[in-house]
Amino acid sequence: MFAVAAVTQSTDDPLSGLHVGDIDEPPVPEDWVSIDVVTCALNHHDLWSLKGVGLPGDRLPMILGCDAAGQAPDGAEVLVYPVISSPGFQGDVTNDPRRSLLSEVYPGTLAERVRVPAGNLVPKPEGLSWEQAACLPTAWLTAYRMLFTNAAVHPGDTVLVQGAGGGVATAAIQLAEAAGLRVWATSRDAAKRDLAKDLGATETFESGARLPDRVDAVMETVGAATWSHSVNSLRPGGTIVISGATSGDAPAKAELTKIFFKQLRVIGSTMGTRDELARLARFVADKGIEPQIDSVLPLAQARTGFERMAAGDVGGKIVFRV
């Protein structure tokens, strides 16, 4: 089976461990189904796996990828929900301490076929293209839960999105604008600030710039580099929702005094539930949102996509056609 896999790991040269080509096809576990992948997409999670983060070396080789859309055995067009719960777990799977993402314990989506529990399939709305559908299961689902479940923002509220340009950030901008929120975004890069405006941001600012007003919520994925700015940008009683720390997880100042004095809420957010993915897909289709796609490549050119992501030269999702 043709697939993209991690065969070795390196923090200094992660792409040295990337294999693009044929690999032995894994068996289908009992009560799981095999999906013929039509499109799949890249996430920073895949780069971290190549660096040895979240993927122990004894599980190599491991097919990478968390995002996919394809056809079920009955011909249905589906999105793949990539969170695998532990046996017998009940409730919100994002709170399952033994949960995993595809490509951590079980083979991922960057392949001709992917195996998942039958309950992990979500119908693909007719209004979504295959390329758009592949964008949703990881970055877009993360942004959806951040905004609508954890920040609990309402039309007319002001949301600050830190680090415009990445997959979660671009998704948050597009989703927030479609929901009637006022969206402000930051980036060090002028081109990415322009992209944020094109996607629906009302205003854009250089990273760390003083804002004209306090905001109701901050969508934080950058971490250490923007943490103090996020805290200082909130109105009293406002909310920071954090789902990543690409610049590091140890800010120079924790800002604890400001957090308790201003009664700020700091909420961690990881992925989302299958039901949230279904609602997200319906919302995107109903609102006519076109997820920002940086590029579409054949899966055989996956290395090019990985190289661009590693260089930070990305504005939106990188999608692969199988």
Segments from the language model and where they lie:
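Glycine-rich beta-strand-centered segment in the early N-terminal region that forms part
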Residues: 24-41, 53-94, 102-107, 125-127
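NAD(P)H dinucleotide-binding glycine-rich loop of Rossmann-like/cofactor-binding domains
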Residues: 82-163
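Glycine-rich phosphate-binding loop and adjacent beta-alpha segment
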Residues: 179, 225-292, 321-322
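N-terminal Rossmann-fold cofactor-binding loop
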Residues: 186-190, 221, 244, 270
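A short acidic, Gly/Pro-enriched loop at the edge of an enzyme's catalytic core
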Residues: 210-218
